[in-house]
Every structure is written in C-alpha cells, then in structure tokens.
Amino acid sequence: MQTLRRQAAWPCVPRGTLEVDFPPPLYSDDYLSQEGPRWTPAIKQATRWKYTPMGRDAAGQLWYTGLTNSDSREAWYTLPRAPDSPYREAYARWHGCYGHRERSLPSAYTQRLRETAWYDPIIPAQYTDPSTRWGSVLWKDRPIRGKEFAINRHRFGVEALWRASDYVRYLSAPQRPRYTAQNYRQWGLEPYCPATNQRPPPVYTPSH
C-alpha cells in the first residue's frame, strides 16, 4: 500500500510500468507519453517528446510542424503538454538546452538554427547576407538543359535572337531540332522519322 501511494504521487508514470504493470488494451486509442533520448542532436529536437498511440495506430502518425497547418494546437512545440501545465514543456526543454547558442549568434543564424528542426521550403527565411535564399536552401540559377521556361517561346523568329528575351539555349532556333517547332503549320505534311532520317517514297501526282 505504501508503494502504491508513492507511485501515485509521482508526477509522471515510469517507463517500466507502462507495459508491465498497466498494459494498455490491444485496440486502444489512448495516447501515452513516451520519453525519447535525452541527448540528441539539434535536428531531432522536435521528435524527442511526442504522444504516441498504442494499438492499431502505432504504425505512423501525421505530426504537424506548425508551419503548414492552420491549427496551432497540433504544432510540435505544443506536444506533449500536461493538462495542468501553463507552458509548453517541449519548447521549454529545447530552449533551455539551446538558448545560450541563440544568444551568441546573430539573429539571422538563430533562424537557421530553428529551421534545422523542421525544414519547410515554403516559408522563405531572411538572412543578413545578400545572396538569395529560399527556405534554408541557397538559390542558384544554373542553366539546366531542357528545363528552361520562356513565356513566348512559341513566337521565336518574331524578333532577332540577340534582342529576344525568350531565347532558350539548345532549344531556340536554329538549335532546335527539325520538326520540333511549336508552330505545327510549318511542318511538312509528309511523314518523317527523325530517328532513322527516312522519308517515304514520293507519291506520283499527274500534272495536267
């Protein structure tokens, strides 16, 4: 009886008693808090504390990051949270471990430090250096063959190539292969195979 009273006064349930003394039912939707590793890299800071369902839903759960969903209650920094806790436990633990790193770095780098936990390229980050970034990826304009996009590429030949802004390397005329122009009215009516470079025999048409 003394042991049961002592266990009831504990603020949390020991991990050893989750499955042994109080085994949950097999098909249960109850959420049990599982403690993760204590010393993990910063990139795994958001996965340390999570409510994991036991039973048929234990395979994999959709866990919102708080960046792309509208419901802020499902964000990672709000889980897990005790019903009587006035603060976010997971964020407080993370901030206590990495707060001294943020104070010693510029503001732009602290945002990069926070982005390492949940990479979301939809939200562009602000950095002190002038190079263009999108999310946490450095944006570089590299000419990729065949991947360029021009708004009025179908109007090639209207203006000179050296003055046209829609000139695409390897794809604009005269580099564009035969019978690949967008204007199909300029194609020949005779069938042609570009792979074998074969043309059909000419059809005899009597002239009057």
Swiss-Prot record:
Compartments it resides in: Cytoplasm, Cytoskeleton, Cilium axoneme; Cytoplasm, Cytoskeleton, Flagellum axoneme
Main subcellular localisation: cytoplasm
InterPro entries: TKTI1
Tissue: Expressed in trachea multiciliated cells.
Keywords: Cell projection, Cilium, Cytoplasm, Cytoskeleton, Flagellum
Keyword Phosphoprotein: no
GO cellular component terms attached to this protein's record: axonemal A tubule inner sheath; axonemal microtubule; sperm flagellum
One Pfam family matching this protein: TKTI1
GO biological process entries: flagellated sperm motility
Subunit structure of this chain's protein: Microtubule inner protein component of sperm flagellar doublet microtubules.
Job description of the protein: Microtubule inner protein (MIP) part of the dynein-decorated doublet microtubules (DMTs) in cilia axoneme, which is required for motile cilia beating. Located at the center of the tektin bundle where may function to recruit tektins or stabilize the bundle.
Identification of the protein by name: Tektin bundle-interacting protein 1
UniProt organism field: Bos taurus
